[in-house]
Amino acid sequence: MTGLILAAGASTRLGEAKQLLVYQGQTLLERSIRLAFSVCKEVVVCLGAEVEQTVPIIQRLKVEFPTLSYLEVGNWEKGMGESLSVGLRTIDQNKDVLVLLCDLPFLTNAHMKNIISLANSERAIVASFQGVNSPPVFIPASLRTLFNGWSGDQGLGKFWRQNPMLCEIIHFSDKFRDVDVPEDREYWGI
């Protein structure tokens, strides 16, 4: 299984690069990479807006995680769907993929392991935090073609809304709180 971290956005609502924010001694990008490697053999990071600042983080972590790589999403401004589509096309089509975002500081290795414990070849596994569906999302190789041609601001929500029979929801009691606006940064003490 390959981890795919979507970290190409410009963080316009936050006003600064969320990938570079430090939480518990690590940037949010580094934290996401470590979480992905807790269950994945290789990880690909989609970069865009902050490539000059994020590539050095990835290069430093390659010493610890030799199967870590990144790709620059040319049209990252189009939205998350563009990064998702480009990232999925880059990864071998025969591999299952775990999609993560880099702005979810509440995620733990236990969340990753619980999601992967339900992995199968026929259904996507979607995390739900107190009723809010969100990545991480496990996508089996058999469903990956459904994402071909995605672009724009089509996140994964479109997938689980249009294909409920192809998704299994794993419920967590944790509150969903990402890092999107300055108030979120204050909430997390970042």
Regions found by a protein language model. Name each.
Residues 13, 53-57, 146, 178, ...:
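Phosphate- and divalent-cation-binding pockets in alpha/beta enzyme and binding domains
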Residues 15, 30, 144-147, 183-189:
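N-terminal/domain-start segments enriched in small and hydrophobic, helix-friendly residues
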Residues 1-133, 165-172:
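Nucleotide and nucleotide-moiety/phosphate-recognizing core
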Residues 3, 149-190:
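Conserved alpha/beta core of the MobA/IspD/sugar-nucleotide pyrophosphorylase nucleotidyltransferase superfamily
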Residues 111, 142-143, 175, 184:
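Short, well-ordered alpha-helical scaffold segment located
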Residues 113-161:
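Flexible, gly/pro- and Lys/Arg-enriched active-site loops
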Residues 26, 94, 141-143, 182-183:
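Short loop segments at secondary-structure junctions
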